[in-house]
Regions:
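Short, polar/flexible loop-turn hinges at active-site or ligand-entry regions and domain interfaces
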Residues: 71-74, 115-118, 169-174
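Conserved non-catalytic scaffold segment of RNase H-like nuclease domains
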Residues: 2-112
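Short alpha-helix plus adjacent loop in nuclease-associated cores
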Residues: 124-151
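Short, glycine/acidic-enriched loop or turn micro-motifs at the edges of active sites
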Residues: 14-16, 127, 184
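Acidic, Mg2+-coordinating catalytic module of metal-dependent nucleases/exonucleases
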Residues: 98-104, 109-110, 147-217
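Hydrophobic, well-ordered secondary-structure scaffolds
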Residues: 1-2, 12-21, 166-170, 191-196
């Protein structure tokens, strides 16, 4: 019997700066998908890293997490160790064999997620988008028309901008909450698949030292 490959699209919200080698995650969300369907989602809050008294959290974010903690579908873990165990079990229960994120060099290298996915095949969705859509004339025109450029003059490829392109909705604003972001990143990945083009696996976007293996899946 043929079994479709299951992918997990993962997003984390963390404390810490861009230069930190490890960032404590207070929110982890993931979506298990095949090429045809969404199988499952998980929404984890890590209490030991959720410092609601900190100025780091704006008023809107504090209200969001207060409400989230009351949601019965949310898994509340008191420590990162507990979150690792819960998340690893979810990956196993869903037979996940490949993990994906938009900017894997952060989510997969600087959070507790790295211990849950050790040895798994992975895709950087930002890299996949660059390989399949980001270099097309249509995407370049889209960025030109809307002013979506980096400081160095390159087309922006944040999850928010990529999702705006694949949905043709320039008003979309990314939530920057883990599960919601994983859902939009799953749709970006599906748009990459729809091109039927090869893209890179097991390498982070911008990690040019890694061997770039292009494959169709």
């Amino acid at each position: 019997m043929f079994t479709e490959k299951t992918f997990a699209v993962i997003d984390t919200e963390t404390k810490g700066g861009v230069k930190d080698t490890y960032c404590p995650a207070y929110h982890c969300g993931a979506t298990a998908i095949t090429r045809r369907e969404t199988k499952s989602t998980i929404n984890i809050v890590v209490i030991e890293n959720l410092d609601m008294a900190s100025a780091f959290y704006g008023k809107q974010k504090k209200e969001y997490y207060r409400d989230l903690l009351k949601d019965p579908s949310v898994i509340i873990c008191f420590t990162e160790e507990e979150a690792k165990a819960v998340f690893s079990k979810w990956l196993a229960d869903n037979n996940v064999t490949c993990v994906c994120a938009h900017n894997t060099s952060f989510d997969f290298c600087r959070t507790f997620v790295r211990e849950c996915i050790e040895g798994m095949e992975f895709f950087d969705i930002m890299f996949a988008f660059f390989d399949t859509i980001g270099q097309t004339k249509r995407y370049n025109q889209f960025c030109a028309e809307n002013g979506y450029y980096t400081a160095s003059g390159n087309c922006r490829m944040t999850a928010e901008i990529c999702y705006r392109f694949v949905t043709n909705d320039t008003s979309f604003i990314e939530e920057h909450t883990a599960l919601a972001d994983s859902l939009i990143e799953a749709e970006i990945l599906r748009a990459c698949w729809a091109t039927h083009k090869k893209f890179t696996r097991n390498a982070h976007k911008g990690d040019y030292r890694a061997k770039q293996i292009r494959c169709k899946i």
